[in-house]
Amino acid sequence: MTNSKNRFGNKFIGAHVSAAGGVDNAPLRAREIGANAFALFTKNQRQWVAKPLEEKTISAFKANCALLGFSPQQILPHDSYLINLGAPEAEKLEKSRLAFIDEMERCQLLGLNLLNFHPGSHLEKISEKACLYLIAESINLAHQAVPDVVAVIENTAGQGSNLGWRFEHLAEIIEQVEDKSRVGVCLDTCHTFAAGYDLRTPEACEATFAEFERVVGMHYLRAMHINDSKVKLASKVDRHHALGKGEIGWDCFEYIAKDSRFDSIPLILETIEPELWPQEIEQLRKYHLSSIA
């Protein structure tokens, strides 16, 4: 049952907002769209190196989050797209690992404890097994370098040589991570669907999440990306769409909004029409609140 203090219910619903002009602007942009969760890049996602966060920016970010009621468990930083923690070439792997540690350090400075990342790609040069081992080893090295921050592996659509599209890939990485309290999964609905796991009906959702529980374990689910898909089931192509406009449809998103297994984790829109985010957030919240009234 919600009360006036908890008008959002038990769901953390938001979107990946811009940090242009400074990361301290991200919580303001999230609240403008009615969100009580958000994702952000803590640096330019298409550059290897960024200048360190300034103390005044860190303080302003923390102050804005406190003012607007965003706790660390409602915020999902995303790392750079350049990083490949399973890179087959030693130089690229080392560069990726150093960049990932830097991303974790930035999270720590901002008082955040989750870091969402794409697992990695073998580039057709090493085996899947070798690549998954390198990804796990990269996480272990980052854990040794930076305390507290949880490495949140995002499942992928299966494009090219990217790993992480099968639940078994995620399980194999986690199995090789030493500190399992600091590793988790972010399930992207578009990626899940594109990889071949059906989400179009409540029954399909039930089966897919039962499979995730069997192979990985729901206790590892630390976040979700809520996206419809422009492409058909098992297409292995990553093309996000606005909710209800794609191949998945609203039944899936209503299912997630009403199911308590997805409470208290960031549920982040990365849909392609940001002008629709306020309506998408409002609709998801309506579904959620109707289920707990």
From Swiss-Prot:
UniProt-annotated binding residues for Zn(2+) 1: H78, H118, E154
Positions of Zn(2+) 2 binding: E154, D188, H225, E270
An example Gene Ontology biological process: base-excision repair
Keyword presence, Nuclease: yes
Cofactor binding annotation: Binds 3 Zn(2+) ions.
UniProt-annotated binding residues for Zn(2+) 3: H191, D238, H240
EC class name: hydrolase
UniProt cross-references to Pfam families, sorted A to Z: AP_endonuc_2 (PF01261)
EC number: 3.1.21.2
Cofactor(s) listed: Zn(2+)
Gene Ontology molecular function: deoxyribonuclease IV (phage-T4-induced) activity; DNA binding; DNA-(apurinic or apyrimidinic site) endonuclease activity; phosphoric diester hydrolase activity; zinc ion binding
Keywords: DNA damage, DNA repair, Endonuclease, Hydrolase, Metal-binding, Nuclease, Zinc
Keyword Transport: no
Top-rank lineage group of the source organism: Bacteria
Disulfide bridges in this chain: none
CDD domains: AP2Ec
Catalytic activity: Endonucleolytic cleavage to 5'-phosphooligonucleotide end-products
Family the entry assigns: Belongs to the AP endonuclease 2 family.
NCBIfam families in UniProt: nfo (TIGR00587), PRK01060.1-4 (NF002199)
Job description of the protein: Endonuclease IV plays a role in DNA repair. It cleaves phosphodiester bonds at apurinic or apyrimidinic (AP) sites, generating a 3'-hydroxyl group and a 5'-terminal sugar phosphate.
Protein's recorded name: Probable endonuclease 4
Organism, as annotated: Vibrio vulnificus (strain YJ016)
